[in-house]
Structure formats: structure tokens, C-alpha cells
Amino acid sequence: MAYTTFSQNKNDQLKEPMFFGQNVNVARYDQQKYETFEKLIEKQLSFFWRPEEVDVSQDRIDYAALPEHEKHIFISNLKYQTLLDSIQGRSPNVALLPLVSIPELETWIETWTFSETIHSRSYTHIIRNIVNDPSIVFDDIVTNEEIIKRAQDISSYYDDLIRDSQLYGLYGEGTYTVDGKECVVTLRSLKKQLYLCLMSVNALEAIRFYVSFACSFAFAERRLMEGNAKIIKFIARDEALHLTGTQHILNIMAAGQDDPEMAEIAEECKQEAYDLFVAAAEQEKAWADYLFKDGSMIGLNRDILVQYVEYITNIRMQAVGLPLPFQTRSNPIPWINAWLVSDNVQVAPQEVEVSSYLVGQIDSKVDTNDFDDFSL
């Protein structure tokens, strides 16, 4: 069935599945099939921030004084994060919105994707401040072999889903040849592609940022590149929310409470999902090798980062019902939690940009029952 921006068929959105039902018509939020997505939207909106709010002028001085191997670590991570958020700033909208059937999930995907564009703008804000010619950095992203190796794994799941869902929308089920490749398109094969695409996105949000995050926070622990670390802290807070969103979608699918066929597909794809996560973890270990090829930094080295990748991979895989692949069970860099959990840090508002400040998070609804325990 071809995608329509406004279906005129009246339907009960509470009875629609998350995906592959009737396209959303009225964007209504007085009722939700899954209230979690509404809460995620509200939380993301309360997080709203702009990179220009953070003063990164001291970072230019700090960066100039770094030894060459630490400059390599810092700038390489920014390149890699730019790649990840370039993909995430457009792909969820392009791939998922034509398939969504409930308004709260549709709006969550749009809200999520918009926040990713802020992340991309942040990297430009940081890079523009520390180097004289930012284009040298950005131009290297699409030619850097280490970065491109990761880009293919990340983008292929999106690309396959987008291609086949467009074929399905235009022509229905069948076998088609696109760019010399034979594509067998069925509704079930699309559901499988969707599940694996979401699992790939989950791995991206769950693992792929965290080597870079750890390095940024390790610099800040030494009172270096602190403006960058404040921005990365905002980004990490957003990414944790996006991770919660994909975990929730995947767990609903696996439980079969939304679409019984998705539960079958989740079971059928368990090994592929496991392999996908482990491959992402191994790539991040290889990224740590690349970062530290010329030397370590104070408080962080290749071996510590490898242990951290294994630790965090176990946690993320357990959250979506997958077996644990690694022996590492304890966090080798516990100090990172002070950066990843915004409530852990108390600061004076006049001294720094306050990353724990939220907007519109007071519940102003009052019911007569709220006064039942009052006595005069």
C-alpha cells in the first residue's frame, strides 16, 4: 500500500500496531497506545539545548597545548561522532516514518531525529573553535578508512529497509532488480529488516558513542577541553534517552504484544542480533586500537577502554533479551558515571552551564483526590 501523508480512512489508533498498520492521520495525543513514547517526547523537549550556550574558547588554548597523539585521539573521536550523528540526523525519519502507525511513536521518532541534528551542529561548533580550517577535518571523514569501515555496517541496515519499503509501497510484494541486485520483497521480510535495523540502531546508541565519550570525559578529568566535555555530556544524556526508546520498541516487538509475528521474527533473528552487537563491540575495540596507536592518555588506555566496551555491551544486550558475550562484569572506569548521570553533579548556576536543568518538568495537574490526606 502506497504511503499517504493523511489517510482519510477512520481508524482506532489504539488498535494499530507500531509499524505496518494504517499510516497515521490525525496526530492526537489525548490517548496513547504506548505512553512511554509520550514520556520520552516530553523528556527530550525538556532537555532542549544549543551548543552555542557552551563557551569553548578555553578549549582552543587547551587543544594547541596537547601532544600530537592526544590531538589525534580528540579530533578522531569528533570525526567519528560526526559520522554517527550525520546518519542518525536523517535516517530514522526517512526509514521509519513511512512505516509508523501510531502518532506518539511517529512524534517520538521526529523528536529523536531532530535532537541528533543538534549533536551534529555541536561537533561543528567544537571543531570550528579549535582548528583554523574545519573543512580539512570534515573532508577527511568520508576518506578516513577507519571511519568508513564502521559507516558501512551502520548504514546498510537503513539502506536495505528504505529500498525495500519503497518497493513495497509502490508495487507491493514481489521480486525486483535494483542496481543489479535482486530484491525479494514480502511483508514478513520487511518486518525482519525493520527488526534488524532497529537492533543495529540500538547497538549504535548503546555502544558506538561510548569510547569517544570516555576519552572526552578523561580530558575533562584533567581540566582540559572542558567546554567539549560539557557539550558531550548533553549529547550523552540525549543518547541515553534514544537508547531507551529503541530498547522499548524492541522489547514490545519481542513480547509479541503489538504484533504476534514480530515475536516470531525476534526469536528467529536472535543469533543475527547477537552477532550484530558483538561485531559492533569488536569494531569499537578496534577503534580504541586506532585512537591509542601513538600513545595513551593519563587515566585511559587501550586495555581499559576494551574492558569498558565489553562491560557496557553486556549491559546493553541484557536489556534487549540477548545473552552476554563477555566475561567483564564490573565497570573499569567508574568515574565516568559522574558524567553520564547528570543528577550526580551539583554546580553553582552562575559558574557553569547547568546540564541538569530541565524545562517544563513540573506536573501542574491537580485533582481533588490530591487533597484527601490533608487535614485542617
Curated annotation (Swiss-Prot):
In the UniProt entry, which residues are flagged as the active site? 123
NCBIfam families in the record: PRK09101.1
Q: What is its EC number?
A: 1.17.4.1
Q: How does it assemble?
A: Tetramer of two alpha and two beta subunits.
Instruction: Give the top-level enzyme category.
Output: oxidoreductase
Name the catalysed reactions: a 2'-deoxyribonucleoside 5'-diphosphate + [thioredoxin]-disulfide + H2O = a ribonucleoside 5'-diphosphate + [thioredoxin]-dithiol
Residues that coordinate or bind Fe cation 1:
85, 116, 119
Q: Which keywords does this chain's UniProt record carry?
A: Deoxyribonucleotide synthesis, Iron, Metal-binding, Oxidoreductase
MF terms from GO for this chain are: metal ion binding; ribonucleoside-diphosphate reductase activity, thioredoxin disulfide as acceptor
Q: Which cofactor does it need?
A: Fe cation
What role is this protein assigned? Provides the precursors necessary for DNA synthesis. Catalyzes the biosynthesis of deoxyribonucleotides from the corresponding ribonucleotides.
Give the protein's recorded name.
Ribonucleoside-diphosphate reductase subunit beta
**Can you supply a Gene Ontology BP term from the record?**
deoxyribonucleotide biosynthetic process
Task: Give the lineage.
Answer: Bacteria, Pseudomonadati, Pseudomonadota, Gammaproteobacteria, Pasteurellales
Which SUPFAM superfamilies does the record cross-reference, listed alphabetically?
Ferritin-like
Is Metal-binding a UniProt keyword of this protein?
yes
What species is this protein from?
A: Haemophilus influenzae (strain ATCC 51907 / DSM 11121 / KW20 / Rd)
User: Has UniProt tagged this entry with the keyword Iron?
Assistant: yes
